Amino acid sequence: VGSHNGLKYDTDEFLIAGGGRPLIYATYITLLDKGDKVIYPVPSWNNNHYTHLSFCEKIEVETQPENNFMPTAAEIAPHIQEATLIALCSPLNPTGTAFSKSALAEICDLVVAENKRRSPDQKPLYILYDQLYWTLTFGETHHYDPVSLRPELRDYVIYIDGLSKAFSATGVRVGWSFGPKYIIDKMKS
């Protein structure tokens, strides 16, 4: 992760599992309580199911072709104060489109501002960042991630990654998650 993405995480801030799917679900059940709200774009892969299985409420942001089927800060902003989790994926499954640097930075700025606004007795706003397809970017498409753009988000971002897509080995179910140690520890338990 450090040599490819420039992110610095200790080994105890990683969790390895049989693919990305159990890690996404572990993130949901670790961070969310019944009735919490989750923001995610549509189309997207299985966030509706994870939200349902976690007994949470969905806030679906319908993406638009003119935005490359990626959610924008303007679309997310009206819902941000009521949410506990924003589930993002870049490149996005199923469209294959990716965040531009500026579009992701704007969403990150919303999360930074919202977490500063929240009182200590409120849950923070987290980002689940599924980047399983990041190695499959070509040409002028570049991969960006929240903590590289806004290091102050480090305590609020849980990454999902894996090797099956990058190596065209979809039968090899190896995924990893990394993020704040206290969250990864809860996911492990």
Report each predicted region and the residues it spans.
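Short, conserved active-site loop motifs that form the nucleotide-linked donor/cofactor pocket
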Residues: 14, 125, 157
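Residue-level marker for buried hydrophobic side chains located in beta-strands
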Residues: 90, 127-128
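Conserved core of the PLP fold type I
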Residues: 1-122, 134-151
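Glycine- and other small-residue-rich loops at beta-strand/loop junctions that grip anionic moieties
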Residues: 96, 125, 161
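Conserved core segment of the aminotransferase class I/II
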Residues: 150-189
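Walker B catalytic acidic pair
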Residues: 131
